[in-house]
C-alpha cells in the first residue's frame, strides 16, 4: 500500500498547540455542514438541480439537502411565492432550529418578478415574510451564481458572534410574520401595498352569524288552481 506522508504537518504540529475560541469553532462547524431545505416553486429551481451533478459537485461545500425543516439550518427559496403558499413558507421557517439562514434565489422570489405588477395573489418579495440573508438575483441565476451565494453565506457565518446573533433575533422577529395555531398575522406590518389585507384576512366565525341568515326566504304567491294564466 502507498503510504501518505505529511512532513509539513508533522513538523509544525509536533511540539505546538492549536488554540481557538468556542465561537470560531462553532462557526467553522456550521459553515462546513450546511443542511438546506429546498423550497422551489418554478423554473429557478431547475438551475439548482444542476449543482447535484459532478460538474459543480455541491457536496464539497458540505451541503446535505433535507426533507424536514427540523433538520435544516438553511432554506433556499426559488420561484414565485403566492398568497396561499405564504403561511406554509413561514411555518417551515419557524420549524427550523436556530441559527437558521435564508437565500432568496431569483427575481420572482426577491421582488415578485413579472408577476409583481398586476397580480393580486403574488407576494412582492419573500423578505415580507421571512428575513433574508443573501439575495441572489437573476431570471434564472446560473449555477455559478448559486455557488457564489453559498460562499458569501459561509463568509457571513464565519464572522458571526454568538452574542450579536442572539440579540439580533428579537429585532428580526419584529419585522417578519409568524403563525400561531395556523392563524396568520403580523406583529408590525412592513408591507407597502394593499395586498396584505387579503393575506391576513380572517373570515368571521359561523357562530357569530345569526340563524336567520341561513333560513331567510321570501314567500312565493302561487295563482289559484282554477285560474288560467295566459
Swiss-Prot record:
One family name in Pfam for this protein: Oxidored_q6
Signal peptide positions (record): none
GO molecular function terms listed in the Swiss-Prot or TrEMBL record: 4 iron, 4 sulfur cluster binding; iron ion binding; NADH dehydrogenase (ubiquinone) activity; quinone binding
Catalytic activity: a plastoquinone + NADH + (n+1) H(+)(in) = a plastoquinol + NAD(+) + n H(+)(out); a plastoquinone + NADPH + (n+1) H(+)(in) = a plastoquinol + NADP(+) + n H(+)(out)
Subunit composition and interactions: NDH is composed of at least 16 different subunits, 5 of which are encoded in the nucleus.
Function of the protein: NDH shuttles electrons from NAD(P)H:plastoquinone, via FMN and iron-sulfur (Fe-S) centers, to quinones in the photosynthetic chain and possibly in a chloroplast respiratory chain. The immediate electron acceptor for the enzyme in this species is believed to be plastoquinone. Couples the redox reaction to proton translocation, and thus conserves the redox energy in a proton gradient.
UniProt protein name: NAD(P)H-quinone oxidoreductase subunit K, chloroplastic
Lineage: Eukaryota, Viridiplantae, Streptophyta, Embryophyta, Tracheophyta
Gene: ndhK
Amino acid at each position: 500500500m502507498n503510504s501518505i506522508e505529511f512532513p509539513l504537518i508533522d513538523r509544525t504540529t509536533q511540539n505546538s498547540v492549536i488554540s481557538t475560541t468556542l465561537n470560531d469553532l462553532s462557526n467553522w462547524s456550521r459553515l462546513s455542514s450546511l443542511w438546506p431545505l429546498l423550497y422551489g416553486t418554478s423554473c429557478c429551481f431547475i438551475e439548482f438541480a444542476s449543482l447535484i451533478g459532478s460538474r459543480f459537485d455541491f457536496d464539497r461545500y458540505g451541503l446535505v439537502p433535507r426533507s424536514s425543516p427540523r433538520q435544516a439550518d438553511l432554506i433556499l427559496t426559488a420561484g414565485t411565492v403566492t398568497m396561499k403558499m405564504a403561511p406554509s413558507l413561514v411555518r417551515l421557517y419557524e420549524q427550523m432550529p436556530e441559527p437558521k439562514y435564508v437565500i432568496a434565489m431569483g427575481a420572482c422570489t426577491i421582488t415578485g418578478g413579472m408577476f409583481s405588477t398586476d397580480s393580486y395573489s403574488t407576494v412582492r418579495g419573500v423578505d415580507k415574510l421571512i428575513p433574508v440573508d443573501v439575495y441572489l438575483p437573476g431570471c434564472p441565476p446560473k449555477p455559478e451564481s448559486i455557488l457564489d451565494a453559498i460562499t458569501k453565506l459561509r463568509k457571513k457565518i464565519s464572522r458571526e458572534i454568538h452574542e450579536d446573533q442572539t440579540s439580533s433575533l428579537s429585532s428580526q422577529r419584529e419585522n417578519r410574520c409568524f403563525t400561531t395555531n395556523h392563524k396568520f398575522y403580523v406583529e408590525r406590518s412592513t408591507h407597502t401595498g394593499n395586498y396584505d389585507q387579503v393575506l391576513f384576512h380572517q373570515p368571521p366565525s359561523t357562530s357569530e352569524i345569526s340563524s336567520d341568515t341561513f333560513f331567510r326566504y321570501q314567500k312565493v304567491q302561487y295563482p289559484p288552481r282554477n285560474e288560467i294564466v295566459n
